[in-house]
Regions:
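C-terminal functional modules
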Residues: 395, 413-533
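Hydrophobic-face positions in mid-chain alpha helices that act as interaction patches
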Residues: 233-390, 395-396, 401, 405-454, ...
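Membrane-proximal, proline-rich intrinsically disordered regions
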Residues: 19-70, 74-75, 104, 115, ...
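Bacterial Sec-dependent N-terminal signal peptides
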Residues: 1-28
Length: 533
C-alpha cells in the first residue's frame, strides 16, 4: 500500500516548496498522533528519500552539475530546453525553479531529521535513532551549504517556535559545527541498543554500518576543507579513519528505489523521457577519460545507438556498447545550424540515417539502459569515494593509515563493484577490476590528479553529479575547458554555486542581503564559497 509522508511545519523560514512527487508517498499519515505515542522511526525513510530526491532527476544536479563538470553533454539549447542550464550555462524557462529545489527539498529532509532528533532526545531506547537523526541532518545541511555557501543553520528548522526569518551562518561555522556533531553522534552509536526499524538504506538499522557511515561522512566533510582549513581537515580525517570508515562496497550508503511502489529513481525517470533519451549523451571529457586507460566500465555505461533518428529516440533498443565505438559529445554545441552547430565541432564524426530518419548526433555515446532503470539505486556515499579520499589524505600527510597506492587501488576496484548495483548488466568481474587497477597504479608525481579524476569518474558514473561537482571545485581535477556559449549566465566560466532561491530575497531580505554581502561578486553562479579555494 502506498503511504503518505508526514506533514511537518518545521521548514526553514518561509520556504515555498515545489510540487511533491512520487517519493512523497512513503509513510503512514500520523498527523493526528501525539508526540508521546508517535514512533519516530517512521521519519527515517522520509529523511532518506527526500535527501536523495533533492539530488536526483529534475530537482537540480542532472540539470546543472552533470554537464558543468562534463560527465554528460546535450545539444539542447534555448529558453524552453532545460538542459541549457547545464551544458551551455544558459537560462531556461524554469531555471529559477530548478535552482531552488536542492535548497527546498534538503531543508525539508533536514526538518524531518530535526523532528526525529527532538522526539528521541533523552530516551535510552531510541538513542541510536537520535544519533542517526543528527548524522542525517549533517548529510542534508552539508549538501545545501556545498551548493549555496552561507545558509540558515543555528536558527533554521525553528518555525514551530516562531523563527521564520532565520539568519545565515557562514559556511565555515556550519561545517565546523557539523563535523563536531557527526563525531559526537557517531561515537554514541551503540550496537547493544535497539536499532532503527524503518531504515531505507541497505543497512536496515545495522548499527555497525551506520557507525561506518557516520565516520565516512566525517571524512568526506573533513576533506572538503583540505585547502580552506588544512588543520581542521587533518584533525577530523584522522578521527574518522581511527573510528572506522567503510571497509567494502557492502557498506555503500544508498536508497534502493522501487518504481512499482511509487518512489522511483528520478534520474532513471528523466533519462527515460524522449528528449533526454535522444539528446543527453556522455561528454567527450568522460568518454575520452575512460578510453585513455581502457576502463572496463566503458562497455557497461555507454552505447552508440543503431543508425537513424528512430533508433536514437528508442527507450528500449540497446545500442553498440563496444568500447572502441564510443565517442563522447563535446559540451557547448547545438542543432541550430549556426557556428555552434554540432557539425562544426572538431572531429565531428558525422550523423547516421538518411532523409526523415537522419540524425546528426547518431554516432555519439549515450547512457546504456542501466541508467533508464526507474528502480535503480540512488547513491549517497560509497566505499570507493571513501578509499579515494583516504588516498588523498595520505598524500597530504594525514595519519589515516595505509598507503596512498593501496587506498587508490581499493577505490578504483570499488567504483567498478558499486556499479553492479544498477543491475546484472553493469557487473564487472572482480578479476577484471583487479587487473585494471594493477595495470593503472597510482603514480606519486601525479597522485592528486589521478585520485581526483578517478573520484570524478566514479561519482559521475554512479549519477552522483553534485558530489562530482563539489569535489571538482575542491580539487581542481579534472582540468576542464569551460563552455562559452552565447548568452550564458556565468561569463564563460564553469558555475561554482547556485544562487539562493528567489524567495529568500523577498521574504528573508535582511538576512539574505547580509549573506550576499559576504560573496565576492554577489549572489551569482561563479562566486566562490569559503571552502572553494
Amino acid at each position: 500500500m502506498k503511504k503518505k509522508l508526514i506533514a511537518l511545519s518545521l521548514l526553514v523560514g518561509a520556504i515555498q516548496f515545489s510540487c511533491t512527487d512520487d517519493l512523497d508517498l512513503l509513510n503512514t499519515d500520523p498527523t493526528k498522533a501525539a508526540a508521546s505515542t508517535f514512533d519516530p522511526n517512521l521519519l527515517l525513510p522520509s529523511i532518506q528519500f527526500e535527501h536523495v530526491n533533492a539530488n536526483a532527476g529534475y530537482n537540480g544536479p542532472i540539470l546543472f552539475q552533470s554537464m558543468w563538470v562534463q560527465v554528460l553533454a546535450s545539444t539542447t539549447s534555448g529558453a524552453a530546453n532545460y538542459y541549457s542550464n547545464a551544458d551551455k550555462y544558459v537560462i531556461s524557462g524554469n531555471t529559477n525553479d530548478y535552482m531552488q529545489r536542492t535548497w527546498n527539498i534538503d531543508y525539508k529532509a533536514a526538518s524531518f531529521a530535526y523532528e526525529m532528533e527532538q522526539l528521541t532526545k533523552g530516551k535510552p531506547a531510541l538513542a541510536n535513532l537520535n544519533s542517526i537523526a543528527i548524522i542525517m541532518q549533517a548529510q542534508c545541511l552539508a549538501a545545501i551549504a556545498d551548493t549555496y555557501g552561507d545558509i540558515p543553520y543555528t536558527q533554521a528548522l525553528q518555525a514551530k517556535t516562531g523563527t521564520t526569518l532565520p539568519v545565515y551562518d557562514t559556511q565555515e561555522s556550519v561545517y565546523k559545527s557539523l563535523l563536531t556533531r557527526i563525531e559526537t553522534a557517531t561515537n554514541a552509536l551503540n550496537p547493544s541498543s535497539p536499532i532503527a526499524t524503518n531504515d531505507a538504506f541497505a543497512y536496515k538499522g545495522n548499527v555497525a554500518q551506520w557507525k561506518k557511515y557516520g565516520y565516512s561522512l566525517m571524512l568526506k566533510l573533513a576533506m572538503r576543507l583540505a585547502k580552506a582549513d588544512a588543520a581542521t581537515a587533518k584533525t577530523f580525517a584522522e578521527k574518522a579513519a581511527a573510528g572506522g570508515v567503510f571497509s567494502s562496497v557492502n557498506d555503500d550508503a544508498y536508497v534502493q528505489t522501487d518504481d512499482s511502489k511509487g518512489f522511483g529513481n528520478a534520474n532513471g525517470q528523466a533519462l527515460s523521457t524522449l528528449a533526454d533519451v535522444y539528446q543527453v549523451r556522455w561528454s567527450k571529457t568522460m568518454i575520452d577519460y575512460l578510453k585513455s586507460t581502457n576502463d572496463p566500465r566503458l562497455g557497461k555505461v555507454a552505447e552508440v545507438p543503431a543508425d537513424g533518428l528512430v533508433a536514437n529516440q528508442s527507450m528500449t533498443s540497446a545500442g553498440n556498447s563496444t568500447p572502441a565505438a564510443q565517442i563522447g559529445l563535446p559540451n557547448g554545441f547545438d542543432l541550430n545550424g549556426g557556428t555552434t552547430d554540432i557539425s562544426k565541432a572538431p572531429g565531428y564524426p558525422g550523423g547516421t540515417g538518411a532523409g526523415a530518419d537522419a540524425t546528426p548526433i547518431g554516432k555519439y555515446s549515450r547512457p546504456t539502459m542501466i541508467y533508464r532503470n526507474r528502480s535503480a539505486p540512488l547513491f549517497v556515499l560509497t566505499y570507493a569515494e571513501t578509499e579515494l579520499l583516504l588516498a588523498e589524505a595520505v598524500v597530504r600527510g594525514f595519519n589515516v593509515g595505509g598507503t596512498a597506492a593501496q587506498h587508490y587501488k581499493n577505490g578504483v576496484i570499488a567504483g567498478m563493484q558499486s556499479l553492479a548495483k544498477f543491475g546484472s548488466g553493469a557487473t564487472i568481474d572482480a578479476a577484471v577490476a583487479t587487473a585494471y587497477a594493477d595495470a593503472n597504479p597510482l603514480v606519486t608525481a601525479n597522485a592528486l590528479k589521478q585520485i581526483n579524476e578517478q573520484y570524478w569518474a566514479t561519482t559521475g558514473l554512479l549519477m552522483n553529479f553534485s558530489e562530482a561537482w563539489n569535489n571538482w571545485k575542491r580539487s581542481g581535477f579534472p582540468v576542464l575547458t569551460p563552455v562559452n556559449y552565447v548568452g550564458n549566465f556565468s561569463n564563460g566560466a564553469i558555475p561554482r554555486r547556485q544562487p539562493y532561491p528567489t524567495g529568500e530575497a523577498t521574504l528573508n531580505t535582511a538576512n539574505y542581503q547580509t549573506a550576499v554581502g559576504k560573496l565576492t561578486g554577489g549572489d551569482n553562479w561563479v562566486s566562490r564559497t569559503w571552502w572553494d579555494k
